[in-house]
Amino acid sequence: MVHIKKGELTQEEKELLEVIGKGTVQEAGTLLSSKNVRVNCLDENGMTPLMHAAYKGKLDMCKLLLRHGADVNCHQHEHGYTALMFAALSGNKDITWVMLEAGAETDVVNSVGRTAAQMAAFVGQHDCVTIINNFFPRERLDYYTKPQGLDKEPKLPPKLAGPLHKIITTTNLHPVKIVMLVNENPLLTEEAALNKCYRVMDLICEKCMKQRDMNEVLAMKMHYISCIFQKCINFLKDGENKLDTLIKSLLKGRASDGFPVYQEKIIRESIRKFPYCEATLLQQLVRSIAPVEIGSDPTAFSVLTQAITGQVGFVDVEFCTTCGEKGASKRCSVCKMVIYCDQTCQKTHWFTHKKICKNLKDIYEKQQLEAAKEKRQEENHGKLDVNSNCVNEEQPEAEVGISQKDSNPEDSGEGKKESLESEAELEGLQDAPAGPQVSEE
Protein backbone atom coordinates (compact mmCIF):
# COMPACT_ATOMS: atom_id res chain seq x y z
CA MET A 1 0.00 0.00 0.00
CA VAL A 2 1.39 3.42 -0.98
CA HIS A 3 1.99 5.68 2.02
CA ILE A 4 -0.05 8.88 1.76
CA LYS A 5 1.45 12.00 3.32
CA LYS A 6 -0.66 14.58 5.14
CA GLY A 7 -1.44 17.80 3.31
CA GLU A 8 -0.08 16.69 -0.07
CA LEU A 9 -3.26 17.20 -2.09
CA THR A 10 -3.73 17.62 -5.82
CA GLN A 11 -5.98 20.40 -7.07
CA GLU A 12 -8.76 17.88 -7.78
CA GLU A 13 -8.48 16.47 -4.23
CA LYS A 14 -8.83 19.97 -2.78
CA GLU A 15 -11.92 20.45 -4.92
CA LEU A 16 -13.31 17.12 -3.63
CA LEU A 17 -13.02 18.27 -0.02
CA GLU A 18 -14.86 21.47 -0.91
CA VAL A 19 -17.57 19.57 -2.81
CA ILE A 20 -18.12 17.27 0.19
CA GLY A 21 -19.07 20.29 2.26
CA LYS A 22 -21.04 22.33 -0.27
CA GLY A 23 -21.48 20.38 -3.50
CA THR A 24 -23.56 17.50 -4.81
CA VAL A 25 -23.01 13.75 -4.94
CA GLN A 26 -22.81 13.96 -8.75
CA GLU A 27 -19.95 16.47 -8.56
CA ALA A 28 -18.13 14.29 -6.04
CA GLY A 29 -18.64 11.22 -8.23
CA THR A 30 -17.13 13.03 -11.21
CA LEU A 31 -14.05 14.03 -9.20
CA LEU A 32 -13.61 10.52 -7.77
CA SER A 33 -13.43 9.11 -11.29
CA SER A 34 -10.36 11.26 -11.95
CA LYS A 35 -6.91 9.62 -11.89
CA ASN A 36 -5.60 12.54 -9.83
CA VAL A 37 -7.94 11.85 -6.90
CA ARG A 38 -7.06 9.33 -4.18
CA VAL A 39 -10.15 8.35 -2.18
CA ASN A 40 -8.04 8.10 1.00
CA CYS A 41 -6.05 11.32 0.55
CA LEU A 42 -5.20 13.24 3.73
CA ASP A 43 -5.53 16.95 4.44
CA GLU A 44 -3.09 18.81 6.69
CA ASN A 45 -4.84 17.41 9.81
CA GLY A 46 -4.83 13.83 8.57
CA MET A 47 -8.54 13.79 7.71
CA THR A 48 -9.75 11.69 4.79
CA PRO A 49 -12.71 12.70 2.57
CA LEU A 50 -14.79 10.07 4.42
CA MET A 51 -14.02 11.71 7.76
CA HIS A 52 -15.08 15.10 6.36
CA ALA A 53 -18.34 13.65 5.02
CA ALA A 54 -19.09 11.85 8.31
CA TYR A 55 -18.45 14.93 10.45
CA LYS A 56 -20.58 17.15 8.20
CA GLY A 57 -23.47 14.67 8.26
CA LYS A 58 -23.43 13.89 4.51
CA LEU A 59 -24.93 10.40 4.33
CA ASP A 60 -24.99 10.08 0.52
CA MET A 61 -21.39 11.32 0.31
CA CYS A 62 -20.33 8.68 2.84
CA LYS A 63 -22.02 5.92 0.84
CA LEU A 64 -20.40 7.16 -2.38
CA LEU A 65 -16.92 7.27 -0.84
CA LEU A 66 -17.33 3.79 0.64
CA ARG A 67 -18.38 2.43 -2.77
CA HIS A 68 -15.16 3.90 -4.18
CA GLY A 69 -13.07 2.05 -1.58
CA ALA A 70 -12.70 4.59 1.24
CA ASP A 71 -10.90 3.15 4.28
CA VAL A 72 -13.40 3.26 7.14
CA ASN A 73 -10.67 2.45 9.68
CA CYS A 74 -8.05 4.99 8.56
CA HIS A 75 -6.17 6.10 11.68
CA GLN A 76 -3.95 8.89 10.35
CA HIS A 77 -5.74 11.83 12.01
CA GLU A 78 -3.44 13.98 14.15
CA HIS A 79 -5.49 13.15 17.27
CA GLY A 80 -6.26 9.56 16.31
CA TYR A 81 -9.89 10.14 15.32
CA THR A 82 -11.59 7.66 12.97
CA ALA A 83 -14.53 8.08 10.59
CA LEU A 84 -16.78 6.35 13.15
CA MET A 85 -15.74 8.87 15.80
CA PHE A 86 -16.62 11.77 13.50
CA ALA A 87 -19.97 10.15 12.67
CA ALA A 88 -20.74 9.70 16.36
CA LEU A 89 -19.73 13.28 17.18
CA SER A 90 -22.02 14.59 14.43
CA GLY A 91 -24.95 12.78 16.04
CA ASN A 92 -26.10 11.29 12.73
CA LYS A 93 -27.52 7.84 13.49
CA ASP A 94 -27.71 6.74 9.84
CA ILE A 95 -24.07 7.59 9.14
CA THR A 96 -22.99 5.87 12.35
CA TRP A 97 -24.84 2.74 11.21
CA VAL A 98 -23.32 2.93 7.70
CA MET A 99 -19.80 3.14 9.18
CA LEU A 100 -20.44 0.11 11.37
CA GLU A 101 -21.84 -1.91 8.46
CA ALA A 102 -18.75 -0.98 6.43
CA GLY A 103 -16.58 -2.63 9.08
CA ALA A 104 -15.66 0.25 11.39
CA GLU A 105 -13.87 -0.96 14.51
CA THR A 106 -15.59 0.11 17.72
CA ASP A 107 -12.75 -0.43 20.20
CA VAL A 108 -10.16 1.89 18.56
CA VAL A 109 -9.16 4.80 20.83
CA ASN A 110 -8.02 8.34 20.00
CA SER A 111 -5.06 10.24 21.47
CA VAL A 112 -6.85 10.74 24.81
CA GLY A 113 -7.86 7.08 25.07
CA ARG A 114 -11.55 7.40 24.18
CA THR A 115 -13.54 5.13 21.86
CA ALA A 116 -16.19 6.37 19.42
CA ALA A 117 -18.98 5.47 21.89
CA GLN A 118 -17.24 7.33 24.71
CA MET A 119 -16.74 10.40 22.51
CA ALA A 120 -20.43 10.37 21.55
CA ALA A 121 -21.47 10.06 25.20
CA PHE A 122 -19.15 12.95 26.12
CA VAL A 123 -20.98 15.33 23.75
CA GLY A 124 -24.45 13.99 24.57
CA GLN A 125 -25.11 11.95 21.39
CA HIS A 126 -26.75 9.09 23.30
CA ASP A 127 -28.55 7.63 20.27
CA CYS A 128 -25.21 7.06 18.56
CA VAL A 129 -23.84 5.50 21.74
CA THR A 130 -26.76 3.05 21.75
CA ILE A 131 -26.24 2.14 18.08
CA ILE A 132 -22.52 1.48 18.57
CA ASN A 133 -23.01 -0.53 21.76
CA ASN A 134 -25.73 -2.68 20.17
CA PHE A 135 -24.11 -3.32 16.81
CA PHE A 136 -23.62 -6.97 15.92
CA PRO A 137 -21.68 -7.69 12.68
CA ARG A 138 -23.65 -9.71 10.15
CA GLU A 139 -20.57 -11.90 9.55
CA ARG A 140 -20.82 -13.28 13.10
CA LEU A 141 -24.37 -14.42 12.39
CA ASP A 142 -23.55 -15.75 8.92
CA TYR A 143 -21.12 -18.16 10.59
CA TYR A 144 -24.13 -20.20 11.74
CA THR A 145 -25.60 -20.35 8.21
CA LYS A 146 -22.83 -22.76 7.12
CA PRO A 147 -22.35 -26.35 8.32
CA GLN A 148 -19.58 -26.52 10.93
CA GLY A 149 -17.48 -29.58 11.76
CA LEU A 150 -19.49 -32.78 11.44
CA ASP A 151 -22.80 -30.96 10.96
CA LYS A 152 -24.61 -31.85 7.75
CA GLU A 153 -26.90 -28.83 7.93
CA PRO A 154 -26.31 -25.28 9.16
CA LYS A 155 -27.72 -24.35 12.55
CA LEU A 156 -29.48 -21.37 10.94
CA PRO A 157 -31.06 -21.43 7.46
CA PRO A 158 -29.53 -18.59 5.36
CA LYS A 159 -32.99 -17.12 4.65
CA LEU A 160 -33.46 -16.44 8.39
CA ALA A 161 -30.17 -14.57 8.84
CA GLY A 162 -31.50 -11.22 7.58
CA PRO A 163 -34.69 -11.06 9.70
CA LEU A 164 -32.84 -12.35 12.77
CA HIS A 165 -30.02 -9.82 12.35
CA LYS A 166 -32.60 -7.01 12.26
CA ILE A 167 -33.95 -8.10 15.64
CA ILE A 168 -30.47 -8.61 17.14
CA THR A 169 -29.36 -5.09 16.23
CA THR A 170 -32.53 -3.35 17.41
CA THR A 171 -32.02 -0.79 20.16
CA ASN A 172 -35.61 -1.16 21.36
CA LEU A 173 -35.84 -4.17 23.68
CA HIS A 174 -39.52 -3.78 24.52
CA PRO A 175 -41.06 -7.29 24.41
CA VAL A 176 -44.04 -6.03 22.38
CA LYS A 177 -41.67 -4.53 19.78
CA ILE A 178 -39.73 -7.80 19.47
CA VAL A 179 -42.97 -9.78 19.02
CA MET A 180 -44.08 -7.23 16.40
CA LEU A 181 -40.79 -7.69 14.50
CA VAL A 182 -41.35 -11.45 14.54
CA ASN A 183 -44.97 -11.11 13.47
CA GLU A 184 -44.24 -8.80 10.53
CA ASN A 185 -41.91 -11.32 8.86
CA PRO A 186 -43.59 -14.49 7.50
CA LEU A 187 -40.27 -16.37 7.64
CA LEU A 188 -40.20 -16.06 11.42
CA THR A 189 -43.84 -16.86 12.13
CA GLU A 190 -43.21 -20.59 12.02
CA GLU A 191 -42.50 -22.72 15.06
CA ALA A 192 -39.57 -24.56 13.42
CA ALA A 193 -37.91 -21.30 12.30
CA LEU A 194 -38.10 -19.69 15.74
CA ASN A 195 -36.78 -22.88 17.34
CA LYS A 196 -33.62 -22.59 15.24
CA CYS A 197 -33.36 -18.85 15.91
CA TYR A 198 -33.54 -19.10 19.69
CA ARG A 199 -30.98 -21.94 19.74
CA VAL A 200 -28.56 -19.80 17.73
CA MET A 201 -29.14 -16.94 20.19
CA ASP A 202 -28.25 -19.28 23.05
CA LEU A 203 -25.05 -20.32 21.23
CA ILE A 204 -24.05 -16.68 20.74
CA CYS A 205 -24.79 -16.01 24.42
CA GLU A 206 -22.55 -18.92 25.45
CA LYS A 207 -19.78 -17.75 23.12
CA CYS A 208 -19.91 -14.22 24.56
CA MET A 209 -19.46 -15.55 28.09
CA LYS A 210 -16.70 -18.07 27.30
CA GLN A 211 -14.53 -15.99 24.97
CA ARG A 212 -11.36 -14.37 26.29
CA ASP A 213 -12.84 -10.85 26.19
CA MET A 214 -16.09 -11.73 27.94
CA ASN A 215 -19.06 -9.63 26.81
CA GLU A 216 -21.76 -9.88 29.49
CA VAL A 217 -23.91 -7.13 27.97
CA LEU A 218 -24.22 -8.83 24.57
CA ALA A 219 -24.72 -12.21 26.26
CA MET A 220 -27.62 -10.84 28.33
CA LYS A 221 -29.21 -9.28 25.24
CA MET A 222 -29.00 -12.55 23.28
CA HIS A 223 -30.46 -14.49 26.22
CA TYR A 224 -33.32 -11.99 26.63
CA ILE A 225 -34.29 -12.12 22.93
CA SER A 226 -34.08 -15.93 23.08
CA CYS A 227 -36.58 -15.93 25.97
CA ILE A 228 -39.01 -13.73 24.00
CA PHE A 229 -38.67 -16.10 21.01
CA GLN A 230 -39.54 -19.05 23.25
CA LYS A 231 -42.66 -17.23 24.44
CA CYS A 232 -43.60 -16.64 20.79
CA ILE A 233 -43.22 -20.36 20.04
CA ASN A 234 -45.95 -21.15 22.59
CA PHE A 235 -48.32 -19.02 20.48
CA LEU A 236 -47.30 -20.59 17.14
CA LYS A 237 -48.06 -24.21 17.90
CA ASP A 238 -50.24 -26.37 15.62
CA GLY A 239 -49.59 -24.04 12.69
CA GLU A 240 -51.69 -21.22 14.16
CA ASN A 241 -50.35 -17.68 14.47
CA LYS A 242 -51.61 -16.33 17.78
CA LEU A 243 -48.93 -13.68 18.28
CA ASP A 244 -51.61 -10.97 18.45
CA THR A 245 -52.90 -12.76 21.54
CA LEU A 246 -49.40 -12.65 23.05
CA ILE A 247 -49.17 -8.90 22.33
CA LYS A 248 -52.50 -8.34 24.11
CA SER A 249 -51.30 -10.39 27.07
CA LEU A 250 -48.16 -8.25 27.30
CA LEU A 251 -50.17 -5.01 27.13
CA LYS A 252 -53.08 -5.92 29.40
CA GLY A 253 -53.05 -3.62 32.42
CA ARG A 254 -54.34 -4.27 35.90
CA ALA A 255 -57.64 -2.67 36.88
CA SER A 256 -56.26 -0.23 39.45
CA ASP A 257 -53.74 1.69 37.34
CA GLY A 258 -53.32 -0.10 34.00
CA PHE A 259 -49.81 -1.41 34.82
CA PRO A 260 -48.87 -4.40 32.54
CA VAL A 261 -48.13 -7.01 35.20
CA TYR A 262 -47.60 -9.96 32.81
CA GLN A 263 -45.03 -7.96 30.82
CA GLU A 264 -43.11 -7.15 34.00
CA LYS A 265 -43.14 -10.81 35.09
CA ILE A 266 -41.90 -11.99 31.66
CA ILE A 267 -38.90 -9.63 31.79
CA ARG A 268 -38.05 -10.55 35.39
CA GLU A 269 -38.33 -14.24 34.54
CA SER A 270 -35.97 -13.90 31.55
CA ILE A 271 -33.36 -12.16 33.73
CA ARG A 272 -33.71 -14.83 36.43
CA LYS A 273 -33.13 -17.59 33.84
CA PHE A 274 -29.74 -16.19 32.73
CA PRO A 275 -27.57 -19.31 32.99
CA TYR A 276 -24.36 -17.63 34.20
CA CYS A 277 -25.03 -16.81 37.86
CA GLU A 278 -21.51 -15.46 38.45
CA ALA A 279 -21.96 -12.66 35.88
CA THR A 280 -21.51 -9.19 37.38
CA LEU A 281 -24.23 -7.73 35.15
CA LEU A 282 -26.77 -10.31 36.35
CA GLN A 283 -26.02 -9.53 39.99
CA GLN A 284 -26.41 -5.79 39.33
CA LEU A 285 -29.77 -6.34 37.62
CA VAL A 286 -31.04 -8.55 40.44
CA ARG A 287 -29.99 -6.00 43.08
CA SER A 288 -31.80 -3.24 41.18
CA ILE A 289 -35.02 -5.14 40.41
CA ALA A 290 -35.59 -7.60 43.29
CA PRO A 291 -36.47 -5.03 46.02
CA VAL A 292 -38.94 -3.20 43.74
CA GLU A 293 -42.60 -4.11 44.05
CA ILE A 294 -44.32 -4.93 40.75
CA GLY A 295 -45.93 -1.74 39.50
CA SER A 296 -43.38 0.60 41.09
CA ASP A 297 -40.38 2.35 39.56
CA PRO A 298 -37.91 1.40 38.26
CA THR A 299 -39.54 -1.24 36.09
CA ALA A 300 -37.61 -4.33 35.02
CA PHE A 301 -37.74 -3.08 31.41
CA SER A 302 -36.16 0.30 32.24
CA VAL A 303 -33.37 -1.32 34.29
CA LEU A 304 -32.63 -3.91 31.60
CA THR A 305 -32.69 -1.31 28.80
CA GLN A 306 -30.26 0.97 30.60
CA ALA A 307 -27.91 -1.95 31.31
CA ILE A 308 -27.90 -3.31 27.74
CA THR A 309 -28.27 -0.27 25.49
CA GLY A 310 -26.68 2.35 27.70
CA GLN A 311 -29.65 4.70 27.19
CA VAL A 312 -29.67 7.43 29.79
CA GLY A 313 -32.80 7.56 31.91
CA PHE A 314 -32.78 11.31 32.55
CA VAL A 315 -32.93 12.32 28.88
CA ASP A 316 -36.19 14.21 28.33
CA VAL A 317 -37.80 12.07 25.65
CA GLU A 318 -41.12 10.28 25.26
CA PHE A 319 -41.60 6.55 24.57
CA CYS A 320 -44.54 4.79 22.95
CA THR A 321 -46.80 3.15 25.55
CA THR A 322 -47.43 0.18 23.24
CA CYS A 323 -44.06 -0.73 21.72
CA GLY A 324 -41.58 1.41 23.66
CA GLU A 325 -40.26 3.18 20.55
CA LYS A 326 -38.31 6.33 21.34
CA GLY A 327 -39.54 9.74 20.18
CA ALA A 328 -43.29 9.01 20.18
CA SER A 329 -45.32 12.22 19.79
CA LYS A 330 -49.01 11.27 19.43
CA ARG A 331 -51.23 11.60 22.49
CA CYS A 332 -54.61 10.05 23.23
CA SER A 333 -57.10 12.79 22.30
CA VAL A 334 -59.28 12.00 25.33
CA CYS A 335 -56.94 11.78 28.33
CA LYS A 336 -53.84 13.49 26.85
CA MET A 337 -51.75 11.35 29.22
CA VAL A 338 -50.77 8.34 27.09
CA ILE A 339 -48.33 8.59 24.16
CA TYR A 340 -48.06 6.49 20.99
CA CYS A 341 -45.99 6.20 17.79
CA ASP A 342 -49.03 6.20 15.53
CA GLN A 343 -52.65 5.10 15.24
CA THR A 344 -51.65 1.44 14.86
CA CYS A 345 -50.05 1.39 18.30
CA GLN A 346 -52.98 3.37 19.73
CA LYS A 347 -55.54 0.91 18.35
CA THR A 348 -53.51 -2.05 19.61
CA HIS A 349 -53.47 -0.59 23.14
CA TRP A 350 -57.06 0.70 23.22
CA PHE A 351 -58.57 -2.59 24.51
CA THR A 352 -56.85 -2.04 27.88
CA HIS A 353 -56.41 1.75 27.87
CA LYS A 354 -60.15 2.42 27.55
CA LYS A 355 -60.69 1.00 31.05
CA ILE A 356 -58.64 3.77 32.69
CA CYS A 357 -58.85 6.53 30.05
CA LYS A 358 -61.60 8.42 31.91
CA ASN A 359 -59.65 8.34 35.19
CA LEU A 360 -56.54 9.63 33.43
CA LYS A 361 -58.64 12.36 31.81
CA ASP A 362 -59.82 13.53 35.25
CA ILE A 363 -56.23 13.57 36.52
CA TYR A 364 -55.10 15.55 33.46
CA GLU A 365 -57.89 18.15 33.88
CA LYS A 366 -57.07 18.53 37.57
CA GLN A 367 -53.40 19.10 36.71
CA GLN A 368 -54.37 21.70 34.10
CA LEU A 369 -56.60 23.54 36.59
CA GLU A 370 -53.85 23.58 39.21
CA ALA A 371 -51.26 24.74 36.67
CA ALA A 372 -53.55 27.57 35.48
CA LYS A 373 -54.25 28.58 39.09
CA GLU A 374 -50.53 28.72 39.90
CA LYS A 375 -49.88 30.75 36.75
CA ARG A 376 -52.60 33.24 37.71
CA GLN A 377 -51.16 33.57 41.21
CA GLU A 378 -47.68 34.20 39.80
CA GLU A 379 -49.06 36.89 37.49
CA ASN A 380 -50.87 38.55 40.42
CA HIS A 381 -47.70 38.47 42.53
CA GLY A 382 -45.82 40.04 39.63
CA LYS A 383 -48.35 42.88 39.40
CA LEU A 384 -48.13 43.46 43.16
CA ASP A 385 -44.33 43.65 42.98
CA VAL A 386 -44.53 46.22 40.16
CA ASN A 387 -47.06 48.33 42.10
CA SER A 388 -44.96 48.25 45.28
CA ASN A 389 -41.89 49.38 43.32
CA CYS A 390 -43.86 52.30 41.88
CA VAL A 391 -45.04 53.33 45.37
CA ASN A 392 -41.50 53.18 46.76
CA GLU A 393 -40.25 55.48 44.01
CA GLU A 394 -42.95 58.09 44.81
CA GLN A 395 -41.97 58.73 48.47
CA PRO A 396 -44.15 61.83 49.17
CA GLU A 397 -47.35 60.09 48.02
CA ALA A 398 -46.48 56.97 49.95
CA GLU A 399 -46.08 58.96 53.18
CA VAL A 400 -49.42 60.74 52.77
CA GLY A 401 -51.27 57.47 51.92
CA ILE A 402 -54.39 56.91 49.83
CA SER A 403 -57.81 56.69 51.41
CA GLN A 404 -60.43 54.14 50.41
CA LYS A 405 -62.64 56.95 49.16
CA ASP A 406 -60.04 57.92 46.54
CA SER A 407 -59.82 54.40 45.21
CA ASN A 408 -61.84 53.51 42.10
CA PRO A 409 -64.65 51.03 42.92
CA GLU A 410 -64.75 49.95 39.26
CA ASP A 411 -61.29 48.35 39.63
CA SER A 412 -62.55 45.70 42.04
CA GLY A 413 -65.54 45.03 39.77
CA GLU A 414 -63.26 44.53 36.78
CA GLY A 415 -61.04 42.23 38.86
CA LYS A 416 -64.01 40.04 39.74
CA LYS A 417 -65.10 40.03 36.09
CA GLU A 418 -61.60 38.89 34.98
CA SER A 419 -61.62 36.16 37.64
CA LEU A 420 -65.01 34.88 36.49
CA GLU A 421 -63.86 34.88 32.85
CA SER A 422 -60.72 32.91 33.80
CA GLU A 423 -62.79 30.34 35.68
CA ALA A 424 -65.12 30.00 32.68
CA GLU A 425 -62.10 29.37 30.41
CA LEU A 426 -60.83 26.69 32.80
CA GLU A 427 -64.23 24.98 32.82
CA GLY A 428 -63.99 24.90 29.03
CA LEU A 429 -60.81 22.80 29.33
CA GLN A 430 -62.93 19.97 30.67
CA ASP A 431 -64.60 19.42 27.29
CA ALA A 432 -62.65 16.72 25.36
CA PRO A 433 -63.48 14.71 22.25
CA ALA A 434 -64.67 11.17 22.84
CA GLY A 435 -63.34 8.09 21.10
CA PRO A 436 -59.96 6.45 20.64
CA GLN A 437 -57.97 8.99 18.61
CA VAL A 438 -54.43 10.27 18.66
CA SER A 439 -53.46 13.90 18.45
CA GLU A 440 -50.21 15.74 17.83
CA GLU A 441 -48.45 16.74 20.99
Curated annotation (Swiss-Prot):
Q: Which cysteines are joined by disulfide bonds?
A: none
Q: What GO CC terms are in its UniProt record? A: cilium
Chain segments carrying region Disordered: 374-441
Q: Where are the zinc fingers (MYND-type)?
A: 320-357
Pfam families linked: Ank_2, zf-MYND
Leader sequence segment: none
Q: Keywords in UniProt for this one?
A: ANK repeat, Cell projection, Cilium, Metal-binding, Repeat, Zinc, Zinc-finger
Residues at which Zn(2+) 1 binds? C320, C323, C341, C345
Residue stretches of each ANK repeat:
45-74, 79-108, 159-188
Which parts of the sequence bind Zn(2+) 2?
A: C332, C335, H353, C357
The record's note on quaternary structure and interaction partners says: Interacts with the retinal-specific guanylyl cyclase GC1.
Q: What is this protein called?
A: Ankyrin repeat and MYND domain-containing protein 2
| Organism listed in the record | Homo sapiens
Q: Name the lineage.
A: Eukaryota, Metazoa, Chordata, Craniata, Vertebrata
